[in-house]
């Protein structure tokens, strides 16, 4: 409103009296003029209008007319947001006036939800909103004056708005709020509503006893875990709203345990699983390798929930140690480290001589000397070792092979096989052992004894055959004498002389003297005296793993046959034509004695 309107408000509202009371008629020259200077007069006060231009200046007295106070009404006086239409009515006795509307002492700014009648006396709010609540007034105005009605209040009911449940003592984790077991938690439901709402709380499908917008639970346990709901209701709007909040109670953490999928782990196996076992449910899991956080890779992979560690292509250096840690925002607990036992090998097999570390392929050793061979291979668990000699059925078990006294029979190729029963693998290698020393007869003592016995047996058979022939030839002359009488006078032949000698054609020269044997040769078995045998190791050295009680490759025992004693049945007074044959090495002797 400008300055001119303000002046008019004070002055143009003054009405001059329609008739002037004068006691005399003023001369024609007299004129009624208004002083341009503002008068210090207020509304409804008497105003003095001076008349200038006459010798006597009479005074004219008048009074301004007041505007009537308008009245206001609303229908309905209480409205529901987004539902009702509200109409305001302004009534006044004055005419030739304009109506202005005021809300909360401010001129109303009209918008699309409002309608105004042509005379301005009816104001309609088509769809009422909560911001339409407040006091309303109408004001009647003319050129100089205005008059405002008493205020009227519009009550707009609304709500409840969407409910938000807050937990003061919890920690949000996504859509879940976590609280520690044993602590306290306070719930608060926030919403906007007029009039205030009624609150109903639920835990799962159970109705709680709390009916206010806030409540507290002390000493929280796992029983207090779940989905909380708050139902707010407005009895005026007949509307309701439901808010939800999921609460997770974090229990006191216990130590987890790392459990492998198998205890018999073998190198190069396809995979092995390590599981972090814990009785706690709502926890996070983190893995550690050798005390440091584990970094996943193609070789070490984690499951979606981090509770399983998968080791692909198990290697011997994947022993760990491994540990897992369970945690929440309130506490942590880590397992004891687990060291894996991974079986592998055997790797390449090595044969060394005694305590030497260099691998050898050929060994020369003196005859009758001792020899120690060591076989080893990298393996877990330790490998089992088996020794064999080429072209021999004997075997020896253990890392070490000890030969106390080398003989010619120990010469050859020795094989050592290392095996691992858990991995199912075996590897072997060999070494050539050459026994060197002074050469002896190519025949063993047993072979020589056999040859001697064979020769003597042939001699014995030949002697018996010669004796038989001699007897037969000796009997032939007597038959001729009986048949031919001319022989009866012949002289007897002395005992020293033999009437008939076998011809050189019937006996070989070697057996020409057998005819002198008078009697049958008898063969007797003579038991040899007890001789000490060659001594071998009967107990493996302490380095042997199995402690076998047999010695490696004991040479086959020499065939010991009882000695033959050839006893002649010829007369004792006949001179012996054979000497005693003694073979000291096999302790076998043969004696041929002539008959007496």
Curated annotation (Swiss-Prot):
Residues 501-510 have a biased composition (Low complexity). Residues 58-154, 160-246, 256-341, 346-432 form the Ig-like C2-type domain. GO terms for molecular function: protein tyrosine kinase binding. Residues 477-510, 527-563 are annotated as: Disordered. The chain crosses the membrane at residues 451-471. Phosphorylated on tyrosine residues by SYK, SRC and FYN in vitro. It is a single-pass type I membrane protein. Residues 553-562 have a biased composition (Pro residues). SMART domains: IG (SM00409), IGc2 (SM00408). GO terms for biological process: immune system process; positive regulation of cytokine production; regulation of immune system process; response to bacterium; signal transduction. Glycans are attached at residues 96, 105, 280, 306, 317, 368, 415. Keywords: Cell membrane, Cell projection, Disulfide bond, Glycoprotein, Immunity, Immunoglobulin domain, Membrane, Phosphoprotein, Repeat, Signal, Transmembrane, Transmembrane helix. SUPFAM superfamilies: Immunoglobulin. One of its GO terms (cellular component) is plasma membrane. Residues 1-30 form the signal peptide. Disulfide bonds join 90-138, 276-324, 375-416. Residues 31-450 are extracellular. It holds the Pfam family Ig_3. The modification Phosphotyrosine is found at residues 578, 589. Belongs to the immunoglobulin superfamily. CEA family. Interacts (via extracellular domain) with PTPRH (via extracellular domain); the interaction dephosphorylates CEACAM20. Interacts (phosphorylated form) with SYK (via SH2 domains); the interaction further enhances CEACAM20 phosphorylation. This is Cell adhesion molecule CEACAM20. It comes from Homo sapiens.
């Amino acid at each position: 409103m400008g300055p001119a309107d303000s002046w008019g408000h004070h002055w143009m509202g003054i009405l001059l009296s329609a008739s002037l009371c004068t006691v005399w008629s003023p001369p024609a020259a007299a004129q009624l003029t208004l002083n341009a200077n503002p008068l210090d007069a207020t509304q409804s006060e008497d105003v003095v209008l001076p008349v200038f231009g006459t010798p006597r200046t009479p005074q004219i007295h008048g009074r301004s007319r007041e505007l009537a106070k308008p009245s206001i009404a609303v229908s309905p006086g209480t409205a529901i947001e987004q539902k009702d239409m509200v109409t305001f009515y302004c009534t006044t006795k004055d005419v030739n006036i304009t109506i202005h509307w005021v809300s909360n002492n401010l001129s109303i700014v009209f918008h699309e939800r409002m309608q105004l009648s042509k005379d301005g006396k009816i104001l309609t709010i088509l769809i009422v909103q909560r911001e339409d609540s407040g006091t309303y007034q109408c004001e009647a105005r003319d050129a100089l004056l205005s008059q405002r009605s008493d205020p009227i209040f519009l009550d707009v009911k609304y709500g409840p708005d969407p409910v938000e449940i807050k937990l003061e003592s919890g920690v949000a984790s996504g859509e879940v709020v976590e609280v520690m077991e044993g602590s306290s938690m306070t719930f608060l439901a926030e919403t906007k509503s007029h009039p205030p709402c009624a609150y109903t709380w639920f835990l799962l499908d159970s109705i709680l006893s709390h009916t206010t917008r806030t409540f507290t639970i002390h000493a929280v346990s796992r029983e207090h875990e779940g989905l909380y709901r708050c139902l707010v209701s407005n009895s005026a709007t007949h509307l309701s709203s439901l808010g939800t909040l999921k609460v997770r109670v974090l229990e006191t953490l216990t130590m987890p345990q790392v459990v492998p999928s198998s205890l018999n782990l073998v190198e190069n196996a396809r995979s092995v699983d390590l599981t972090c076992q814990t009785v706690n449910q709502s926890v996070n899991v983190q893995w550690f390798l050798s005390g440091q956080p584990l970094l996943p890779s193609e070789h070490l992979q984690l499951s979606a929930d981090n509770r399983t560690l998968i080791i692909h292509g198990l290697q011997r250096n994947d022993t760990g140690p491994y540990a897992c840690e369970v945690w929440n925002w309130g506490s942590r607990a880590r397992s004891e480290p687990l060291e894996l036992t991974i079986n592998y090998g055997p790797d390449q097999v090595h044969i060394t001589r005694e305590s030497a570390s260099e691998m050898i392929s050929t060994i020369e050793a003196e005859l009758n000397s001792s020899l120690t061979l060591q076989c080893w291979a990298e393996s877990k668990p330790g490998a089992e070792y088996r020794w064999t000699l080429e072209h021999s059925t004997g075997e020896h078990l253990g890392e070490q092979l000890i030969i106390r006294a080398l003989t010619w029979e120990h010469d050859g190729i020795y094989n050592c096989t290392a095996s691992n029963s858990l991995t199912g693998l075996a590897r072997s290698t060999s070494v050539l052992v050459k026994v060197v020393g002074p050469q002896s007869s190519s025949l063993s003592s047993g072979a020589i004894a056999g040859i001697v016995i064979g020769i003597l047996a042939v001699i014995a058979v030949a002697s018996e055959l010669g004796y038989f022939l001699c007897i037969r030839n000796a009997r032939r002359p007597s038959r001729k004498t009986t048949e031919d009488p001319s022989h009866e006078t012949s002289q007897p032949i002395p005992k020293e002389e033999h009437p008939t000698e076998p011809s050189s054609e019937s006996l070989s020269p070697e057996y020409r003297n057998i005819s002198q044997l008078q009697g049958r040769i008898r063969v007797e078995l003579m038991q040899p005296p007890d001789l000490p045998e060659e001594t071998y190791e009967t107990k493996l050295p302490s380095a042997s793993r199995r402690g076998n009680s047999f010695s490696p490759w004991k040479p086959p025992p020499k065939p010991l046959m009882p000695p033959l004693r050839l006893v002649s049945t010829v007369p004792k007074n006949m001179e012996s034509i054979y000497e005693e044959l003694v073979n000291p090495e096999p302790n076998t002797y043969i004696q041929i004695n002539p008959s007496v």
